[in-house]
Amino acid sequence: MKTLILLSALVLLALQVQADPIQEAEEETKTEEQPADEDQDVSVSFEGPEASAVQDLRVRRTLQCSCRRVCRNTCSCIRLSRSTYAS
């Protein structure tokens, strides 16, 4: 009788040990399915005078002045060349 109780206790213990990893795996999948705040993209747009200032900064970064010593990083030569091509 004692042997039967001991064996049944071991079987129940083994079943409980096997059930714990399954519950932990289910909890991990639940936390993985929730979207994180880090994954969201944010776009910012400007209207009015601020937009033109931001666009001017982008243009200045992409265009490089070929005569930096003459215009001393004011890029007046680039502005002149753009207005020449525009007309």
From Swiss-Prot:
Q: What is its main location?
A: secreted
- Region feature Disordered, mapped onto this chain: 23-43
Under Pfam families, the record lists: Defensin_propep
Residue ranges annotated as propeptide are 20-56
Spell out the Acidic residues composition-biased ranges: 23-41
Tissue specificity of this protein = Specifically expressed in small intestine (jejunum and ileum). Probably expressed by Paneth cells at the base of intestinal crypts. Coexpressed with MMP7 in small intestine.
Q: List the GO biological process terms.
A: antibacterial humoral response; antimicrobial humoral immune response mediated by antimicrobial peptide; cellular response to lipopolysaccharide; defense response to Gram-negative bacterium; defense response to Gram-positive bacterium; disruption of plasma membrane integrity in another organism; innate immune response in mucosa
Describe its assembly: Antiparallel homodimer; disulfide-linked.
Name this polypeptide is given: Defensin alpha-like protein 1
Recorded source organism is Rattus norvegicus (Rat)
Gene of this entry: Defal1
